[in-house]
């Protein structure tokens, strides 16, 4: 027993001496930031896929490959190839994705350390990222989507996040999201400030601009709405003496429009301001209700022995309503 205790004491004493003279690195030395100026961390971001862009929730789901590369001379070794160590055993810049909502990391948290002390960390992340959207032009809008990284525990003088020119950042050409088309992307250092009064920390952002493909909304929203509005014009071609038929058609059109509004509600973003699509739907609704009011007016005129005036009003409305609707469509959907 005494020999065992003596052996443990000698081993611990020798280890302390080796650490003190730098023969082996101490754990505390490795997990502290290198003191030789700001640590330059080279970042690579590649968007493997974008699964969904949700305008209503103002977020997007993406599959992202992220790579960090930095140099720590304290980790240099005499081996002939890179060694693998757990990430939490060495110092690392602790970079966070600041606009994540839910994020899953699929690669193990390990690093490869080259003989010269270069550290390489690779990770694949999948999840949801928040993105405030300006939807005034919906659905004819273009949006910029970003993934913002930040070394939140370090100032810009302690850690620098830079674009890695040795590895290509970018975005895949074929994406799962079918109703958007990527136009361009950028990857660049971008300081991160949690609040306007706080000091900026070192940051990096990958952004891509995308245009919404409007084919879905033309087929599912715009064309059906045009047909419903056009159906309301049928009342102008029915003789005012047939007031029952006119009112029946007008009410049927109105109820169809109300049901249609409920059906498309899930496809429209819930924002506090009116989008171009909202203006189109709102003005179309007003025109449908206006046709019902016109039917009531002509029916009243016909019953009051003013049939000629009622027919003249219908003839004017046959042209006025389509022209007004065309102006509404151009102003809200084109200009």
Question: Residue locations for each model-derived region?
Answer:
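Positively charged n-region of N-terminal signal peptides that target proteins for export
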Residues: 1-6, 324
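Juxtamembrane boundary at the C-terminal end of a transmembrane helix
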Residues: 330-335
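A residue-level signal for conserved active-site and pocket-lining positions in enzyme catalytic cores
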Residues: 18, 64, 293
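Channel- or pocket-lining gating/hinge segments that regulate access to a cavity or pore
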Residues: 204-324
């Amino acid at each position: 027993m005494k020999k065992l205790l003596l052996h443990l004491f000698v081993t611990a004493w020798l280890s302390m001496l080796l650490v003190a003279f730098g023969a082996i690195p101490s754990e505390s030395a490795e997990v502290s930031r290198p003191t030789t100026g700001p640590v330059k961390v080279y970042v690579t971001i590649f968007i493997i896929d974008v699964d969904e862009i949700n305008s209503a929730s103002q977020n997007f789901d993406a599959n992202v490959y992220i790579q960090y590369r930095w140099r720590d001379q304290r980790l240099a070794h005499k081996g002939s190839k890179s060694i693998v160590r757990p990430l939490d055993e060495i110092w690392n810049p602790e970079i966070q994705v600041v606009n994540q909502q839910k994020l899953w990391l699929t690669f193990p948290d390990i690093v490869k350390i080259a003989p010269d002390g270069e550290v390489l960390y690779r990770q694949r992340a999948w999840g949801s990222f928040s993105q405030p959207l300006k939807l005034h032009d919906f659905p004819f809008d273009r949006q910029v989507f970003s993934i913002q990284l930040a070394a939140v525990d370090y100032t810009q003088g302690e850690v620098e996040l830079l674009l890695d020119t040795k590895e290509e950042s970018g975005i895949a050409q074929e994406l799962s999201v079918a109703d958007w088309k990527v136009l361009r992307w950028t990857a660049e250092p971008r300081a991160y400030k949690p609040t306007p009064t706080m000091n900026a920390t070192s940051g990096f952002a990958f952004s891509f601009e995308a245009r919404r493909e409007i084919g879905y909304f033309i087929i599912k929203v715009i064309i059906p709405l045009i047909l419903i509005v056009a159906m309301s014009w049928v009342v102008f071609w029915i003789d005012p003496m047939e007031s029952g038929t006119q009112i029946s058609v007008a009410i049927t059109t109105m109820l169809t429009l109300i049901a249609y509004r409920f059906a498309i509600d899930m496809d429209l973003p819930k924002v506090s301001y009116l989008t171009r699509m909202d203006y189109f739907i709102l003005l179309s609704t007003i025109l449908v209700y206006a046709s019902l009011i016109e039917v009531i007016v002509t029916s009243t005129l016909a019953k009051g022995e003013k049939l000629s005036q009622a027919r003249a009003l219908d003839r004017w409305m046959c042209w006025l309503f389509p022209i007004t609707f065309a102006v509404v469509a151009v102003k809200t959907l084109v200009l």
